[in-house]
Amino acid sequence: YEHLFDGLVNPVHVLYHWLGQFSGAKSVITAREPDGKKYGPAIFRCHMPNWGYPPHIDSVRNTGSTLHASADQRTQYAVHRFEHQLGGVLLLQAPEEGSASCDSILYRCEWNNEVEDMMETVYLGLDEPEANMISADKFEHYVQANSISTYEVKLLPGDLYFFRAECPHVIPKFLGKRPRITMATFFGYTQSDPEIFVWS
């Protein structure tokens, strides 16, 4: 991994640089556990055609997280301490033009007991056989009934966006033959904490 971008602009370094520019006096570092174990600085994902993620959240602090760890186990993670958690996605390769309606759908919806009651185990296929997700049908009904606004994220290669990890979002399926390739990461901060942790 250390030599993957030799001779090129390293997108991981660019991400950390800009987080540092926006963070004021806070230190931006790769997350680590008290015993010294480090998290990954970012992850590269290859989303294949005809595959996507149903509604889900990514905040480690929340019971609706796609993590398989129990709520009790999650409180033991060093990244759990951060009140605010965000995800960041950089598009490296887009599917064929016209094969995808959008790259992501974001919902202006806070996690709550009603949404938590919609959680179910979903079969995803590929290397992630199953995960905790929000029931797509139930959530769509909830969104309509409560007039929850949505935003469709449409990216070009090189575009980077951030989203609140505690709000539901969807990665829609797309057609074609070319995979969508992204670099993704999460970061957390608390106003009073001098550090911003970045992890994948």
Regions found by a protein language model. Give the residues of each.
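Short edge beta-strand segments in beta-sheet-rich domains
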Residues: 39, 99-101, 178-182
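Short His-Asn-centered micro-motif
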Residues: 47, 88, 164-165
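Short, internal active-site loops enriched in acidic
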Residues: 49-50, 168
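Catalytic core of non-heme Fe(II) oxygenases with the double-stranded beta-helix
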Residues: 50-150
